[in-house]
Structure formats: C-alpha cells, structure tokens
Design a protein with these regions (language model features):
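Conserved acidic
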Residues: 1-252
C-alpha cells in the first residue's frame, strides 16, 4: 500500500526503440561482447567508436536511416494525424451531440488503432523465425534496449528525488516494460497540503515543470552515450493516484 503515487509512461516504446537505435536488416553490424545492462548504466562500456549500440551489444550504422525505422516513422506520423482527428471529432460530438461526429470519431479510432497494431507488430515479425527478415539479434536488441531505458530512468529518478529530499532511499515503487511508479508521499508531506484537489494540481505542475524536463535531459544523456540515430524516448506523466496497492507483479 502506498499513498500518492505518480506514474510515467514511455510513448510507443518498441516502435521508438526501432527508430532510436536504427534497427533494420541492412544497418546491423558486428556486435560487442560481454555487455550487460548494469555495465551500460554505469557507463563501463567504451562507446566511442561512433556506431549506434543496442543494449544486447548489437551495433548499427548511424550514418543513414534504415528501411524499418523509416517505415515505422511514416506509420507513426500517420497514426498521430488520425489520433488527433479522432480527438477533434470526439470533442465536436461532445459539444454538438451531432451523430456524424460520433461516427467520424469511431472511423478515426479504427484507423489509428489499426496503425498502432501495425507498429507494434514490427517487433513480433522480427522475432518470428518464419519472417523473411527474422534475426534474433534484432528482437533481442529491442527488448534489452527497452530494459536499459527503464532501468536507466529508475536510477536517475532515484538520484533526483534523493537529492531533492537529501536521502538515500528508493522512490520507485514499481516498474513495467514502459512505465515507472514513483512514491510522491514525501513531497506531499513536505508541502503540508491536505486538500486532495490542490495536491493533484500541485503534483501535476511539479511533474510537468520539473520531472518531465529532467527525464528528457537524462534520456538525452543515455542517447548520446549509446550513439543512437535519434533520441526517441519520450516519457510523460500518466496517473496521479492518492493510493496505490500492489498485490503481486503486474497486479496493482
């Protein structure tokens, strides 16, 4: 049981990992050995050769965007457009109650959702031995780089809050494939606030003005260290909860 929990989610993680590390059949190079996520987090690995390095040790060309990242980027941009149209149609329906906007919103939802499924299927295809461009190194590069990015942000957020509170504690309650859950109770206690509406507004402002810019900065630090093609990790505040209960892994 935890009071005042805030979650942060990475946006479309696997598609963005493919774009960030330039993961594609024609960009893959020979990899480095004896690489672990812990060694990468502590920056024990030499990454000065200029090639993009994924967390499993696989290396990629970074002088030109690969075929797969290019396709992913195109589909992602299209999904963003249709998702925006969906939200606009939903707002118009809420304002006018005109059924044509309801139908339009549903249409755009289906289009953007199909593109979301298509984007996420890229990882599954790469990891399928019957796929023409199957390569277990590519699939592993995606999953392990995802682990690296989550564990990296766990470490950096703990550093941030320990510095803020002058402590040596662990403020990450839990993490998932693309998200982290932070214990904000000490911050709420510091403010002395008791009104829940005011607390939520204050936490929202703090996350937007302090935490999200910090996350962007430390993800750029990791991207520079790994020589990525493009820094694509975007993490935004998702949930603000006055209480959170964890009964088991992935059960909360």
């Amino acid at each position: 049981f935890h009071e005042w929990v805030v979650s942060f989610d990475l946006n479309s993680l696997y598609p963005h990992l493919i774009m960030q590390y330039n993961i594609s059949p024609e960009t893959i190079l020979e990899g480095q050995k004896d690489i672990t996520i812990d060694k990468l987090i502590s920056k024990e690995i030499d990454t000065t050769d200029g090639h993009c390095l994924a967390a499993n040790g696989t290396m990629y060309k970074s002088d030109k965007q690969g075929m797969l990242p290019r396709i992913i980027q195109k589909e992602y941009n299209a999904r963003t457009i249709f998702k925006k149209k969906m939200l606009e149609a939903e707002q118009m329906y809420a304002n006018t109650k005109d059924k044509k906007y309801e139908k339009l919103a549903r249409k755009y939802y289906i289009v953007q959702h199909s593109k979301k499924i298509s984007l996420n299927s890229a990882y599954g295809a790469i990891g399928n031995k019957y796929f023409r461009y199957y390569d277990h190194r590519q699939a592993e590069a995606i999953t392990m780089s995802g682990q690296l990015n989550i564990k990296w942000i766990e470490k950096k957020l703990n550093e941030y809050f320990n510095k803020l509170y002058n402590t040596k504690d662990d403020y990450i309650i839990a993490s998932d494939t693309d998200s982290v859950y932070i214990n904000m109770a000490p911050l709420v206690k510091m403010t002395g606030a008791t009104d829940k509406v005011k607390i939520v507004k204050a936490l929202d402002k703090f996350c937007k003005e302090k935490v999200e810019p910090y996350i962007a900065t430390v993800y750029k630090e990791l991207a520079d260290y790994m020589n990525v093609y493009q820094q694509k990790m975007e993490m935004a505040r998702e949930v603000i909860a006055d209480r959170g209960i964890w009964t088991a892994k992935k059960r909360y």
